[in-house]
Amino acid sequence: MTTLEMQNLSNLEKELTEVEEKTFRLISFITLYKQYDDLPRKERRLVLKQHKFAYKYYATLKKRIKLIKSR
């Protein structure tokens, strides 16, 4: 791997850990601070959208890191 690819990989890994933290914070917010069932309908939709986006982004970053490492 070139130095540019290594730098890109380290940046992606750093971003991945940040996304992991945000996702787990969101999940813990839902489960610990507010019960999901107690939320109004609009807030439930918003929480679900945020969770889906965070998970998709996390999965995409993992795939990109795996692809770069396999080169």
Each language-model region and where it sits:
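Extended, charge-rich alpha-helical interface modules
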Residues: 2-71
